[in-house]
């Protein structure tokens, strides 16, 4: 029997990384919010890799932080190792990566949720969504509780009709053998939403007591304290190492001998997997010319013996998994604690969404995370934040919050999801961002904190820290620009000679000199030419000076890009009346309904000739 259980302004279904950000954003913006989860014990679960960050992902975590989200703060409290990767490359692709204590990550997020005003948590399975006149009206749980809402955010992860597969064994289930959301997919289909089926997988977890680390290469964290959040304290806590080993010819032969039992190759798995995180058996087959693959043995926390075998994502039968593991150096006597598996799940094709992450055909329904066809905790959290913000803004009858591709990796991802044809799990990569030199992890606060303040997510403490940083950067950069030396200056001549770099021929500022690869901002601090500021400020000054020319070029590119972005397309346009558009372009434009010519230009199937036709049509219409 269905009964009236209550009413909320915003309801969020699912409490993974997307759901937590959505619920916190909505509540912090003043909306009475309900977060519904199938298990309070699995809130902010890390069912796959125990890490946050990496290329493109670290930039996203920093963007979430700058806007007032939680992921960065949470991983700073719960990491067991943190380091910067890609240090040999430019700042556009350098990235933080932290190993998480999975249990502590869950507990820290749970604490934050419990302490958040205007946020309630309910453990239940939602099986139906009620609509009224094409708008979300209420949700109904399996036990009959009916909650009304003004906006609904779906962040169901891989639970929608989840199916676990190990060898020839399969059963209904969510990540880590939890219950799946069995009925909600049917409710979405009744709304007319188009669903697909994707697949992901996870490696086995092994007992650290059975590992011979002497046969592996230690991978320590950075010695200097690091942080994801711009406002976290810098703490130099004890770190746990990761370990590097490799598969070998024997390992690969075991896989090849058992392909007839691999569900990836027997047809048991129907869902489409991610290209950038293939199963181990897929790697062995696709890269048969390689004799070995890297495998990282990673701790899952400080108070557990479980370790994660990064790079060995598999759905091979359990006995084959054991044989594979025991062929790897250091794992000859290994014990499995949890078997690796594949999971299939339902997704909503994201072309059915607006840039606000609201469904085009169902008013008040927002979706975020793996339900939108993405992979990764960071991608999910970012979408959850945006969906939560826009759900709250809609309740307040305000305009949606939409970032541009030139402003954030978050925008690159959302824009890609809606405009590209997503046929496999989407992973954010630095190569997807046209303006990645502008979208660095170090300047996310400078790009986005003001926007977070405007929508009500950046509190006074964060705002004051941001303003102080801006002020220091301006003062110090001006000092470097106006402090100059001539060739006659002996102190400068000795300094440059000691750094094995050419002497100056004309008057040069410290700012200009810093462009030389031989010189570091810390050299200036050592000489007393610059104050010993916070490391974030010193890093920012150095990047701005060294890459000033390249940064200015990208800013010019952005100006050209924004000309098309600012050419808006009327929402009532009839593409059948736009003479000269290709048939495919008409079809795709009708589905996506782009808001601007810039967005239209990025739709798969819309070519430059179609854009020219569209521009001419809009100009003629404007002149009438």
UniProtKB/Swiss-Prot annotation:
GO terms for biological process: tRNA methylation; tRNA wobble uridine modification. InterPro entries: FAD/NAD-bd_sf (IPR036188), GIDA_C_N (IPR049312), MnmG (IPR004416), MnmG-rel (IPR002218), MnmG-rel_CS (IPR020595), MnmG_C (IPR026904), MnmG_C_subdom (IPR047001), MnmG_C_subdom_sf (IPR044920). SUPFAM superfamilies: FAD/NAD(P)-binding domain. It holds the Pfam family GIDA_C_1st. NAD(+) binds at residues 273-287. One of its GO terms (molecular function) is flavin adenine dinucleotide binding. NCBIfam families: mnmG_gidA. HAMAP family: MnmG_GidA. This is tRNA uridine 5-carboxymethylaminomethyl modification enzyme MnmG. It comes from Syntrophomonas wolfei subsp. wolfei (strain DSM 2245B / Goettingen). The lineage of its organism: Bacteria, Bacillati, Bacillota, Clostridia, Eubacteriales.
């Amino acid at each position: 029997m269905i009964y009236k259980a209550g009413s909320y302004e915003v309801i969020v279904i699912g409490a993974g990384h997307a759901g937590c950000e959505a619920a916190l954003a909505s509540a912090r913006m003043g909306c009475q919010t309900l977060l519904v989860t199938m298990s309070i014990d699995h809130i902010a679960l890390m069912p796959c890799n125990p890490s946050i960050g990496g290329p493109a992902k670290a930039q996203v975590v920093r963007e979430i932080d700058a806007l007032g989200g939680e992921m960065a703060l949470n991983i700073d409290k719960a990491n067991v190792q943190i380091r910067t990767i890609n240090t040999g490359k430019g700042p556009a692709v350098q990235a933080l990566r932290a190993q998480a204590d999975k249990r502590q990550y869950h507990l820290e997020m749970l604490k934050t949720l419990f302490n958040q005003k205007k946020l309630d948590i309910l453990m239940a399975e939602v099986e139906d969504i009620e609509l009224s006149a094409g708008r979300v009206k209420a949700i109904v749980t399996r036990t009959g509780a009916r909650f009304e809402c003004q906006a609904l955010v779906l962040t169901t992860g891989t639970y929608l009709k989840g199916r676990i597969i190990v060898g020839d064994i399969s059963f209904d289930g969510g990540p880590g053998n939890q219950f799946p959301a069995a009925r909600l997919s049917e409710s979405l289909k009744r709304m007319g939403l188009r669903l697909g089926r994707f697949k992901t997988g996870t490696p086995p977890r092994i007992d650290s007591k059975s590992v011979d680390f002497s046969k592996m290469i230690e991978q320590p964290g950075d010695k200097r304290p690091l942080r994801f959040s711009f406002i976290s304290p810098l703490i130099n806590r004890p770190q746990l190492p990761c370990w590097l080993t490799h598969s070998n010819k024997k390992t690969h032969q075991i896989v090849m001998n058992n392909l007839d039992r691999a569900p990836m190759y027997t047809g048991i798995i129907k869902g489409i997997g991610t290209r950038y995180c293939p199963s181990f058996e897929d790697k062995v087959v696709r890269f048969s010319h390689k004799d070995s693959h890297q495998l990282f043995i990673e701790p899952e926390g400080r108070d557990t013996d479980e370790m994660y075998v990064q790079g060995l994502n598999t759905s091979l039968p359990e006995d084959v998994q054991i044989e594979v593991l025991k062929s790897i150096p250091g794992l000859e006597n290994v014990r499995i604690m949890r078997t690796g598996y594949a999971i299939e799940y339902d997704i909503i094709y994201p072309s059915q969404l607006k840039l606000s992450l609201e469904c085009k055909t169902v008013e008040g329904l927002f979706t975020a995370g793996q339900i939108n066809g993405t992979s990764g905790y960071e991608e999910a959290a970012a979408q959850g934040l945006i969906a939560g913000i826009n759900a709250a803004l809609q309740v307040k009858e305000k305009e949606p919050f939409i970032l541009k591709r030139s402003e954030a990796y978050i925008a690159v991802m959302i824009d890609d999801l809606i405009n590209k044809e997503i046929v496999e799990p989407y992973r954010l990569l630095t190569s997807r961002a046209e303006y990645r030199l502008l979208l660095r992890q170090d300047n996310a606060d400078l790009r986005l904190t003001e926007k977070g303040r405007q929508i009500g997510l950046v509190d006074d403490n964060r705002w004051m820290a941001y303003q102080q940083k801006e002020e220091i950067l301006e003062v110090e950069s001006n000092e470097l620009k106006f402090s100059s030396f001539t060739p006659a200056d002996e102190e400068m001549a000795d300094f440059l000679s000691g750094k094995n770099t050419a002497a100056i021929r004309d008057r040069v500022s410290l700012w200009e000199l810093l462009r030389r690869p031989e010189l570091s901002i810390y050299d200036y601090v050592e000489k007393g030419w610059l104050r010993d500021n916070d490391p974030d400020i010193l890093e920012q000054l150095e990047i701005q000076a060294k890459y000033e020319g390249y940064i200015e070029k990208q800013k010019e590119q952005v100006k050209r890009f924004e000309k098309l972005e600012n050419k808006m397309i009327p929402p009532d346009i009839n593409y059948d009346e736009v003479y000269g558009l290709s048939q495919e372009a008409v079809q795709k434009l009708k589905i996506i309904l782009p808001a601007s010519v810039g967005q239209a230009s990025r739709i798969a199937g819309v070519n430059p000739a179609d854009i020219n036709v569209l521009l001419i049509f809009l100009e003629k219409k404007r002149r009438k």
